[in-house]
Amino acid sequence: MENPIKPVATRSIGIAVVLLVVGIVIGFAVGHYTVATAPSKPAINTFAAGSLKYALGNDFNPQYTNLTGVRVGMTFSGSISGAREVQEGKNYSVFISASAPILYQDLMNDTHYASWQIIFSANEMAITWTNPKYSILPSWPYWFENITENSTIVAASNASLDPSGFQAIETMKLAGLLYTGWDNSSILVGNEPVSYYVRLAFDDNFAMYMNYNKAYNDWFHGQFGYPVNDSLALYHQIFISKYLNGTTKLTTVEIGLDGYLTAGTADYALTYVSQAINQGLSYYENSTGGNGLPAWINLGSVNKTIDDFYEQINESGPAWDNVGNLPGAPIFYSITVISNYTNPYAIQYVYDLITGLGQHYLSMSKFDPLAQPFYVGDVPAQLKPLVVAPPSYLPVSSYD
């Protein structure tokens, strides 16, 4: 059966864009969801994850305003800090998070700032840089050596303020598990041992696995003295050892990471593929031009088995860089309308972001918009035809 929430394929630019815009204009005329025309349309005060700054701020919002006459007042920052602003009384009408669980836990669950959310796009973690000196070639599979050298400076977001921070932590933990877990019989979450997922990831090719395992142990055991097959060595080296010696730097929001790279104060940044595209950063790619970090660790999968593997680790970090201990989960972007500050045009904005025009601009920025968005909570009637219940195979931790 076809995956009901698979990402939409990236669209080409040109005639398709013209047709898309024309189609949307016609849609407004013949039944597209709208509200009654008013003499003065209030701006939609909107918070969005910083990683959406280009897709929304530069592309979607201007087009939306051209089509509707409704202005969009934007604030871009870390989703966790944005949720705290809502709790403190900031009057956002629309809230868009880079982590559906953060939106649910901070604004829906026992807090009642919102009564629903729609999950509409995925994303992937990547290793990025600007200085060619630090390029990681597609032919080089052992990327973890480059980013963990003592002299290498790595930048990431602070996990307590921004989802990309704890998603970077999850990615490093998953990589450690993937490269050490062939014989790991521990059943951490679910019904299968870690070894089940590792062997699937390597297509039961033990020789291929051993290439990675040997490189991992030669590096972390041989160079740094970690125990053999220590699955947390990669995570520990970046987020504890290098942080303590000043070669891992944390920032408050992912849109600031490029500043570290362009200023030369960091050699690599752990951030989203979409950020690499929007900010003109180089990123680690495989030989076919895709993300060099495989789906098993980049948190971009909407496949049941891979998502089950994500759950084998959690998001917890060291005391200075920690948000909690929820299980690992895909990177899902979600959107809601804040209950106390509902703008009459807020639902229309949500409608257009999760359908054709919004999907187009998200795809241009290397997000993975879902062909079938899904919802949690009491979604408004105007949006119900666009969404489905969460697929049963997705771990609840990916959206709750």
Swiss-Prot record:
Biological processes annotated in GO: molybdate ion transport
Signal peptide coordinates: 1-31
Short name of any one Pfam family annotated for the protein: SBP_bac_11
UniProt key word Signal: yes
Source species, domain of life: Archaea
Gene3D superfamilies per the UniProt record, alphabetical: Periplasmic binding protein-like II
Keywords: Signal
SUPFAM superfamilies assigned to the protein according to its UniProt record, in alphabetical order: Periplasmic binding protein-like II
GO molecular function, one term: molybdate ion binding
Family membership noted in the UniProt record: Belongs to the bacterial solute-binding protein 1 family. WtpA subfamily.
Matches recorded under PANTHER family: MOLYBDATE-BINDING PERIPLASMIC PROTEIN, MOLYBDATE_TUNGSTATE-BINDING PROTEIN WTPA
Protein name: Uncharacterized solute-binding protein Ta1052
Source taxonomy: Archaea, Methanobacteriati, Thermoplasmatota, Thermoplasmata, Thermoplasmatales
